[in-house]
Protein backbone atom coordinates (compact mmCIF):
# COMPACT_ATOMS: atom_id res chain seq x y z
CA UNK A 1 0.00 0.00 0.00
CA UNK A 2 1.19 3.52 -0.77
CA UNK A 3 2.33 5.73 2.09
CA UNK A 4 0.16 8.80 2.66
CA UNK A 5 1.49 12.05 1.22
CA UNK A 6 -0.88 14.11 3.36
CA UNK A 7 -3.38 13.74 6.19
CA UNK A 8 -6.23 15.86 7.48
CA UNK A 9 -6.26 16.67 11.18
CA UNK A 10 -9.43 18.59 11.90
CA UNK A 11 -9.74 21.24 9.18
CA UNK A 12 -5.99 21.31 8.44
CA UNK A 13 -4.09 19.50 5.70
CA UNK A 14 -0.65 18.28 6.77
CA UNK A 15 1.81 17.16 4.08
CA UNK A 16 3.61 14.00 5.22
CA UNK A 17 7.27 13.91 4.21
CA UNK A 18 9.27 10.67 4.40
CA UNK A 19 12.82 11.90 4.01
CA UNK A 20 16.27 11.86 5.54
CA UNK A 21 15.72 15.42 6.76
CA UNK A 22 18.96 16.82 8.25
CA UNK A 23 16.94 18.70 10.88
CA UNK A 24 15.60 15.39 12.20
CA UNK A 25 18.99 13.69 12.38
CA UNK A 26 20.10 16.24 14.97
CA UNK A 27 17.18 15.45 17.26
CA UNK A 28 16.72 12.36 19.42
CA UNK A 29 13.41 11.58 17.71
CA UNK A 30 12.41 9.99 14.42
CA UNK A 31 9.57 12.33 13.51
CA UNK A 32 8.20 15.79 13.96
CA UNK A 33 4.93 17.67 13.50
CA UNK A 34 4.82 21.36 12.75
CA UNK A 35 1.62 23.35 13.11
CA UNK A 36 2.86 26.50 11.35
CA UNK A 37 3.42 25.62 8.60
CA UNK A 38 1.50 22.35 8.73
CA UNK A 39 3.87 19.45 8.05
CA UNK A 40 4.73 16.02 9.41
CA UNK A 41 8.24 14.63 8.92
CA UNK A 42 8.97 10.92 9.25
CA UNK A 43 12.52 9.58 9.16
CA UNK A 44 12.87 7.64 5.89
CA UNK A 45 15.69 5.44 7.17
CA UNK A 46 13.39 3.89 9.78
CA UNK A 47 11.96 0.51 8.84
CA UNK A 48 8.41 0.49 7.49
CA UNK A 49 6.70 -0.60 10.72
CA UNK A 50 8.53 2.07 12.68
CA UNK A 51 7.53 4.68 10.09
CA UNK A 52 3.90 3.75 10.73
CA UNK A 53 4.34 4.07 14.48
CA UNK A 54 6.17 7.39 14.03
CA UNK A 55 3.40 8.79 11.84
CA UNK A 56 0.71 7.66 14.28
CA UNK A 57 2.73 9.23 17.11
CA UNK A 58 2.85 12.57 15.29
CA UNK A 59 -0.86 12.32 14.43
CA UNK A 60 -1.67 11.93 18.13
CA UNK A 61 0.28 15.14 18.78
CA UNK A 62 -1.74 16.79 16.00
CA UNK A 63 -5.05 15.66 17.48
CA UNK A 64 -3.90 16.86 20.89
CA UNK A 65 -3.07 20.25 19.39
CA UNK A 66 -6.57 20.48 17.88
CA UNK A 67 -8.65 19.43 20.88
CA UNK A 68 -6.22 20.31 23.70
CA UNK A 69 -6.21 17.07 25.66
CA UNK A 70 -2.86 17.84 27.24
CA UNK A 71 -1.15 14.55 26.39
CA UNK A 72 2.40 14.26 27.64
CA UNK A 73 5.18 12.91 25.42
CA UNK A 74 5.28 9.83 27.65
CA UNK A 75 1.56 9.22 27.05
CA UNK A 76 1.93 9.63 23.28
CA UNK A 77 4.94 7.27 23.31
CA UNK A 78 2.75 4.61 24.95
CA UNK A 79 -0.45 5.28 22.98
CA UNK A 80 0.95 5.24 19.42
CA UNK A 81 2.34 1.68 19.33
CA UNK A 82 -0.61 0.33 21.34
CA UNK A 83 -3.12 1.90 18.95
CA UNK A 84 -1.16 0.75 15.90
CA UNK A 85 -1.08 -2.81 17.25
CA UNK A 86 -4.81 -2.73 18.02
CA UNK A 87 -5.65 -1.59 14.49
CA UNK A 88 -3.27 -4.03 12.79
CA UNK A 89 -4.51 -7.05 14.77
CA UNK A 90 -8.18 -6.27 14.16
CA UNK A 91 -8.74 -5.66 10.43
CA UNK A 92 -12.46 -6.47 10.72
CA UNK A 93 -12.78 -3.74 13.34
CA UNK A 94 -10.97 -1.28 11.08
CA UNK A 95 -13.21 -2.20 8.16
CA UNK A 96 -16.32 -1.79 10.27
CA UNK A 97 -15.15 1.58 11.63
CA UNK A 98 -14.52 2.82 8.08
CA UNK A 99 -17.91 1.78 6.68
CA UNK A 100 -20.62 4.35 6.16
CA UNK A 101 -23.44 3.35 8.51
CA UNK A 102 -26.96 2.86 7.21
CA UNK A 103 -28.79 5.90 8.49
CA UNK A 104 -32.43 5.28 9.22
CA UNK A 105 -34.83 7.89 10.50
Listing of model-derived features with the role each one plays in the protein:
Residues 53-65:
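Active-site recognition of the HExxH zinc-binding catalytic motif
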Amino acid sequence: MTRPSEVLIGPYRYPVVFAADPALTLQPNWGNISHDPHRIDVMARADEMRQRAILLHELLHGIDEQIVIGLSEKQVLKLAPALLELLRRNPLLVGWLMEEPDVQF
